[in-house]
Structures are given as C-alpha cells and as structure tokens.
C-alpha cells in the first residue's frame, strides 16, 4: 500500500467569486464551468458512454494497424484487472508500467484503475539505477515490461527479480518472469469489487516539480477525471473530439501529456487512437495518410519535422484538422512555418505541469465553437479552475499584462508528492494554489503567455532534466570538486543540459571524460551536451547556485561566437 503525504483540500469557489484584496486578480476560462462526473473512478468515467461506440475502433497499433474496438479494450482491460488481482495486487498497491506505446500499455493502465491500484509509469529507456530509484520510492509490487528491458531489473541493490518483486513481460518471458497471458487470459468476471473513493490515487508519474530530484506525483481519480472533463466535456468542449476523429499518439504514454490529453481524452470522447512506439518521419507520415489522422498532439521537435522536412510534401496530410503542441514552448516562427504547411489545420498550444494534472491552459481555437486566438499564446485557463499570476518576491497577485509566477487552483491538481510533506507544502500553498515555477502573463483577451522559468528544470524535447540529479552524479566523481548544470537554448531540442565543473586539486579531467561518466548513468536525454571548466561555481551567501549568472555566461559566449 502506498502512503501519501498529507494533502491540502482545494477550496471551492463560486464562479464569480472575488477573493480578498491580496488575491483579487483571479482569471477564469471564457467557457462556463460545467458539471463534472469526478465522483466516478477514472476507468468508469472514461467508459461511461461505452454503449454508444462499443464497436468503433479504439486503438490502432502501429504499422501493422491491428485494431481493437472499444468493446475489445474494455474486455481485455477487465481480464487483466482480474489477472492482477489473482497475482495478489490489492487496492492501493503500486504497479510499474515500463513499456513503450502499445495496446498492452493501455490495457494495463485501465486494469490497474479497475482494481483500485496505482500505476507508476516509467521510461523503458531509463538506466537500471533510474528505474530502481522510481521502483524503490514508489514501492511497486510488480513491473509490466518487455523482455528486452529485463536485464536492467536483475539483482539491483539486492532486490531479487521473482522473489522480492514480480515481472510480467508482454512477449516471451526470460527466466523468473511471467508471461502477459497470466493477466490477459484471466476471467473478467473475477475482477474484485473494490470501493474506490475519488481521492484515492490512480497514477503516480514522477516529476522534479520546481526544484530538486524526481518525486512521485499523486494523481487521484478525481484529479484525472476533472482534467479530462475540463478538456473534452460540456456542450462547447475546449478540445472538441468526436467518434470520427483519429488521434495521433506518437508521444510516449509514460509522459502525462500523452496519457491524459491523447489517451484518456480520446477514450472519453469515443475517438480512435493511433499508437506509434517511436518517431520515425517516414512511418509517421504514411500512417497519418493511411488512417486519416485528424488530431495531432505534438511537441516542438515534432513540429519542426512536420514544418521543415521535405518528405512531408510527398504525403496527403489534409485530414489533420487540429495540431496541439505541448510539453514545451513553441516559437512563433516554427508555428508560422507549420501553418504554411498545413493551412487547413487549427494550430495552437496547451500548457501543463505534471503536478497540475497536467493541463492548466489550452487554445480555445480547438473548441466546438472556437474563439479567435493569438500566435505564441498557450491558450486560456481551463474551465472549472482558477489561475492567478503572482510576484515571486512578494506573493502579491498581479493584473493583466504583468509577468509573474503562474499559479493554478482546482480539483484537477495533484494530491501531493509521495512521502514529501515539505515539497508538497512548498508547491501547494495554504489556499490550495499550486505554484508552477513558470513566469508568464495574461493579456487583455485572457490569453496566457509563458516568458521565463523560476524553477530549475531543463526541458529537452519536452522531457524533464533535473539539474540536481546531474549535479549529484558529477560531484560523485573523484576528480570533480563542484558542479552546476543549467540549460542552453537549442533549435532542435528547445534546451540541452550543459555543465560547469570545478576540477579537484591536482586532477586532470577532460570534457569527454565528464560526458562519458554521466552518459553511462542516465537516459539519453539527460546526457551533457557541453562541459565548461571553471575555478568556482557562483553561489549565494546561503550556498544556493546562482544559475542566472551561469545562464548569462552562456548567452554572452553565444553572442561572441562567430
């Protein structure tokens, strides 16, 4: 069973309520609040309208195009739920899903919800230490994965596969592992009757938040049902999806943006989801053309490929009506380049944070009755939520066109960080406001623009790279006395991690040696792209790294490069 850090109840506010003078500038959606069925467990909410589209396609899997209907998806998920129960997984237990995009990922996630357990999703490309950090902190009882990743799971830190924890593989199982059929061939009538409360945890992605190392983010059934409803429910949904739509799912489902805004939103709306395990431009374009993909959820590097790759001209992408870019800011030039490539599509951005469930705002150009929107905006705050912008120094709320830290309040935000009261309290204040660590402003038309970041996090192609994690590894090297990691802007990736390193006295150390030392211990997107050797790391009197000074050094160096 998992133990949660004490949560802070989110205050309920009237639609037009004005708070005290200290928090008087509160922004709401242009769309009216709606009733939300967030009393339902997540799986029940997603399948609430199943009878209306039971025989329509739900999942279309990759180049082979194997298709599962909604009825298939519900049945197989129910069988796996029974199978998990047969293996001893109880309400509140944690199951790790260590898979690339696949139908088995979807079935497993829904099955975990059905028995009141908790899914912690992890990147299968993580190194063994990265996987076991999440596995250990989450106290997972079972891992669902592929055989190719099992070697990473053997005898790490004394935990014995098959004895201390179970591993189920979706393909031929290696020694001491179970085959997925022990789950998928169970009798669906054996799913136990479990009382699930809206505040029970259902998902535990890991996020660094505004600072520090990755932490378990407790998302409840209420969190995720509310977030999905804010996007796709109501007479005029913010994200208008129909049973005729086919959504592109090339972004990894272990990332909350893809899990929520692609998979869960599609399930609720009865749309089909085209699953791709990895991004390969030729395959992507062929599948979009073959399956008449109508909604593409993307990140800026994918936008770059669609806007600039010459292969795009050889395919018919006229079926695409919506392109939603998220996970990292999209530059105006890139946005304009894609508009020129796909003039028929509505292009807009969403803005989110894992801890916020994750969607804070979304382009209203995606609504059933769309609004005019501005280039560069990441939309307006989602309905049934409140947003404010505060001065990071004073905490005073700010009005229109005044940049400050963005804060969000609503029933979609996380319950808290797993076993970390201090981090929870520093992120969600006593009034229920979640502080994002992002700097932005709201313009006169209620559109949100992100301009900077208070938090330390680096975003590489939408993936989180926590500087503290890399700094901890760097200073563990005997030849390194001190180190700091900061982001450097990059056209293709958005940001890349670079390190400033202080050598220990008498030690000789090369840039390549430092890069190799880190590369052996982390997933590919956390690898260092540049190492600068310095005499000292700039720090405040309290010992905090002055990251702004280091970022300024990078910018100066960039302007001086011929």
UniProtKB/Swiss-Prot annotation:
Q: What class of enzyme is it?
A: ligase
UniProt cross-references to PROSITE patterns, sorted A to Z? AMP_BINDING
Is the keyword Nucleotide-binding assigned to this protein?
yes
Chain segments carrying region SBD1 = 280-349
Q: Which reaction does it catalyse?
A: (E)-4-coumarate + ATP + CoA = (E)-4-coumaroyl-CoA + AMP + diphosphate; (E)-4-coumarate + ATP + H(+) = (E)-4-coumaroyl-AMP + diphosphate; (E)-4-coumaroyl-AMP + CoA = (E)-4-coumaroyl-CoA + AMP + H(+)
Q: What pathway is this protein a component of?
A: Phytoalexin biosynthesis; 3,4',5-trihydroxystilbene biosynthesis; 3,4',5-trihydroxystilbene from trans-4-coumarate: step 1/2
What is the name of the protein in this document? Answer: 4-coumarate--CoA ligase 2
